[in-house]
């Protein structure tokens, strides 16, 4: 389309290629390269980077970090590459990475792009991930803000980000004059703050009589889906992982001690989720093209004389994504309606 470096077009595969180049040049995986240089100095112990079929980290996506550890990386940049008195990144690199290397005139992020970093304007910059994952660095206020969320907006500036911007841009560069009454009020307020006790996890108040009726109706039954393109795997995750499904072909039900197992057949894949009759969550492992994903499923249901309806909520625990499937069973037929949250709009 154009000569490299002359125009901007967002493309995560470019960063995947950088991961491949690093492996070729160093003989190390991206994780092996980063461990002594970044993870160990920052005491980042819980990390996982998804790999491609060739065993290379995907580079442009697929990094899983705790929110506290992402905050450490953001703080490292705020410290201009220094951590606990030790320099991990050169100041020259920090300056180059956090400065506009190419203009981004289109879209909502129009302040330019550095080295995998978006400029936010006013000297701020951010690591921006899909569906509301942010690390925003405000050097002029000596602050970082970390946000993990499940926004329906893919990369655009969300209302939460706009609120964050408005709070920081309202700050003054001048020191506040002493105001003892306000300070005393703040201390008293902070002293009263406590963590709420962990609430008891309860079911959804679902009807066990209706559930047992549905379970006896569906136990051992199998339904074939025609002209269906919906998958148990949410569409955003299909796009991110490059694991595309042609849709579920068959749904099979079987009774369990605590509820009902629902198995989805999709081409060569077979995945089972579980409904707890108490309305609670049940964990399982979802597999798509050899990649494993931890999921947790709950269900709600209703039953009539000759029909039943089950709604499944399957959350992919390592992501912000939840697949929602409504199954309407009438006599010998089934209708499956697929939805998800967040969804790219």
Q: Where are the language model's segments positioned?
A:
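Peripheral terminal and inter-domain segments
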Residues: 181-345
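Residues that flank catalytic or metal-binding motifs in active/ligand-binding sites
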Residues: 59, 66, 93, 113, ...
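Active-site-proximal alpha-helical segments within enzyme catalytic domains
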Residues: 14-21, 59-82, 133-150
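Active-site Gly/Thr loop motif
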Residues: 91-148, 154
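Catalytic-site signature segments of enzymes, centered on catalytic residues
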Residues: 1-63
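Structured C-terminal helix/loop/strand segments within mature extracytoplasmic catalytic/sensor domains
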Residues: 129-204
